[in-house]
Amino acid sequence: MSRKQLALFEPVLLVQALTDAVKKLSPRAQWRNPVMFVVWAGSVLTTLLTLAMVTGQIAGGALFTGIISLWLWFTVLFANFAEALAEGRSKAQANSLKGVKKTAFARRLRAPRHDAQADNVPAAELRKGDIVLVKAGDIIPCDGEVIEGGASVDESAITGESAPVIRESGGDFASVTGGTRILSDWLVIACSVNPGETFLDRMIAMVEGAQRRKTPNEIALTILLIALTIVFLLATATLWPFSAWGGNAVSVTVLVALLVCLIPTTIGGLLSAIGVAGMSRMLGANVIATSGRAVEAAGDVDVLLLDKTGTITLGNRQASDFIPARGVDERTLADAAQLASLADETPEGRSIVILAKQRFNLRERDVQSLHATFVPFTAQSRMSGINIDNRMIRKGSVDAIRRHVESNGGHFPADVEQNVENVARLGATPLVVVEGARVLGVIALKDIVKGGIKERFAQLRKMGIKTVMITGDNRLTAAAIAAEAGVDDFLAEATPEAKLALIRQYQAEGRLVAMTGDGTNDAPALAQADVAVAMNSGTQAAKEAGNMVDLDSNPTKLIEVVHIGKQMLMTRGSLTTFSIANDVAKYFAIIPAAFAATYPQLNALNVMGLHSPNSAILSAVIFNALIIIFLIPLALKGVSYKPLSASAMLRRNLWIYGLGGLVVPFIGIKVIDVLLTLLGLLGLA
C-alpha cells in the first residue's frame, strides 16, 4: 500500500482544527457532549460573574473569577480542539478521495454488447442498469459488473496500490469501481448504483464522519459520564448551604471550579476524538468501515473464520509428487496428468505440467496440434481434463473422480483410496487422474503455510480469540494443515451453507464472529457475521454484504482489523480509568482550599502542601484543562497494544492508567502551584 499517511500534527490541520474548535463553542455543538456542556455552562456563568464584579454590580474578586473563567473556556476549547483535529484528519483523507472523482462523459450503449450504438452522456446521468463501454485510457464512470471483455485496470486512486489488476467478465473479478482507470483493452460494464451511491461516495461520507453515529459502547459510557456528572452536580449544589450554615459561604466561582474538577472532563473531552481516530486508523490500514459500530465490533470479536488459501497458506499449491495406482507406472500417470493440464492456466495446473517435464522430460504439447478438446473445471463437475481422439482424461477431487468412474462402469481401487488418505494426512491436497474408467493414480499438491502465522494465532489465543480455518479440502488434509498452522478448529469441505450455519452456531453461543469473503457465494455469510471484511477485488454482492472493505484485498488483514478494534476499545477504557482516577488528586487539592475556612479540620487533606486556597483552586483548574491537551496524541494514536488475555490486560491498564491517573495529578497540580507562587501571579500566591 502506498497511500500517504498523515503526520499526527500537520500544520495545516492544526490551524483548521483551532478554527473549528472556536466554531464548536456554540450551545448547539456543546449540547451533543453533556459533560462538556456543563463545563461550557460554568464558563458562561463565571464570565457573567466577572463582568458583574468589574462593573460593581456584585462584590467579589473579579481578577480571580476572571482567571478561573478563562481556564474553563480553555478546557472547553481544548476538548473541541481534540475532536476537531481528529475530524480534520478524516476530512483530509476524504479530500484525497474526492480528488479521484472526475467529471467525465460516458459511452452509454443502447444494447448490452461492445459493438452496439453508443451515446456520449455525462457520467452523472448514469443510472443503475445502464450499460457503458469503457476503453483504454478512460476513467470508469460508475460502480458495476463487467459483462463483456477484459482489461488491465489502475485502481491506485482507490487502493493506493500501484500494480494494475485484471478485471474481466464472469467469476469473482468482474466488479469494478468508479473513478479507476483502464490501462488496456476495453470493458462493457453494467452500472450497479445510482449517482451519489457509489463505493467512492460511501467512502467519502464515512470518512468525513458528518453522519457518524455513536456506537453502543460510546452510548453506554456517555450514560455513565452523565450519571457521574449529575451526582457531582447535586453534591456540589448541597455544599453551598453547608458552608453558609458554617458561617463562611463558599463563592459560586469556587463551586463551579469544584464541579468542573469533579466531573470526568478528561474522557468527556476526548471521547468523540477517540471514536473518530479509530475510524481514521482503520482507513490508514486501507480498510473502509461502513460505521464506527463495525470498528467497535472488531474489538469485541472472539471468533475468527479464516479462509485457508491466501490467509493461512500462501495459496499457490504446487504439484509435488505423482503416486501411481497399482499396475500403473509413474511415467504413464505423469503423461496423463500433463495432458489433462495442458490448457489449465491455474497455478496448480501449470505446476503439474512443469513437474512432469522435470521428472520424465515430457515436453509440453500443444492442445491444438493434438486436435484435442479441453474440458474446463466447473463447480458442478469439480474436474477438468482433455479429450484426445478416443481418450478421455480427467483430473479432479476424489469424490468427483469416484462418481465419474462409477458412472462409467468402473471401480475405484482401494490402493488409490489409501494413497489419497496418505497424501491428505501429510497436509497436501490429492488430485486423482483417470482415463476413461481406469484410475491412474494421485497427484499431490502441497500448499505452504505462511511464515509466522502460527505465532500470530498463538497471540490471538492469549487474547481469548478462537481461530477457525475454512477450507474446501477434505477432513484429513484440513486437519493436517490446521495442526501445522496452529488454528483452534477447522471447517472442511466448506460450502456457503456450511459457513452460514457455523456463524449462526457461534452467535447462538453469544460469541462475535469475524470473517472475510470476496465471492457472491460468500455474501450470505458476510451479511450474517458481526465483522465482515469484503475484498475490494471481489464481487459487488460481497462488498454490499460486508460492513468493511479491504482495499488491498488481503484476507490476512482481518487479524489487523481485530487489532485496531481492540486498540480503540483499550484506548477508551484506559483514558476513562485515567480520567476517573485523576479526580481523586483534584479532591485533595480543591476541597481543603474551598472549605478549610469553614471546617479547619479539612486542612489535614492538604497533603500536597499547596500555598494558598486561591492558588490550589486555580492549580487544579489549570491542570484539568492542560491534561486534555497532553492526552490528545494518545487519543489519536491509541494506547500501546499488546496481545494479552482480558485479565492481564485489565491488570496492566490499572497499573499504568489507574495508578498513573492517581500520581500524575498530584505532581502536576503541585508544579503549577509552585509556579504560581514563584510568579506571585496576580497576587494569588
Swiss-Prot record:
It is found in: Cell inner membrane. Gene3D superfamilies: Calcium-transporting ATPase, cytoplasmic domain N, Calcium-transporting ATPase, cytoplasmic transduction domain A, HAD superfamily/HAD-like. GO terms for molecular function: ATP binding; ATP hydrolysis activity; magnesium ion binding; P-type potassium transmembrane transporter activity. CDD domains: P-type_ATPase_K (cd02078). It is a multi-pass membrane protein. InterPro entries: ATPase_P-typ_cyto_dom_N, ATPase_P-typ_P_site, ATPase_P-typ_TM_dom_sf, ATPase_P-typ_transduc_dom_A_sf, HAD-like_sf, HAD_sf, P-type_ATPase_bsu_IA, P_typ_ATPase. Pfam families: E1-E2_ATPase (PF00122), Hydrolase (PF00702). The active site is at D307 (4-aspartylphosphate intermediate). Keywords: ATP-binding, Cell inner membrane, Cell membrane, Ion transport, Magnesium, Membrane, Metal-binding, Nucleotide-binding, Phosphoprotein, Potassium, Potassium transport, Translocase, Transmembrane, Transmembrane helix, Transport. Its EC number is 7.2.2.6. The chain crosses the membrane at residues 34-54, 58-78, 219-239, 254-274, 588-608, 616-636, 662-682. Its main location: membrane. It catalyses: K(+)(out) + ATP + H2O = K(+)(in) + ADP + phosphate + H(+). SUPFAM superfamilies: Calcium ATPase, transduction domain A, Calcium ATPase, transmembrane domain M, HAD-like, Metal cation-transporting ATPase, ATP-binding domain N. The keyword Nucleotide-binding applies. ATP binds at D344, E348, F377, T378, A379, Q380, S381, R382, M383, S384, K395. Mg(2+) binds at D518, D522. GO terms for cellular component: plasma membrane. It comes from the Bacteria. Belongs to the cation transport ATPase (P-type) (TC 3.A.3) family. Type IA subfamily. The system is composed of three essential subunits: KdpA, KdpB and KdpC. NCBIfam families: ATPase_P-type, kdpB. Part of the high-affinity ATP-driven potassium transport (or Kdp) system, which catalyzes the hydrolysis of ATP coupled with the electrogenic transport of potassium into the cytoplasm. This subunit is responsible for energy coupling to the transport system and for the release of the potassium ions to the cytoplasm. This is Potassium-transporting ATPase ATP-binding subunit. It comes from Salmonella gallinarum (strain 287/91 / NCTC 13346).
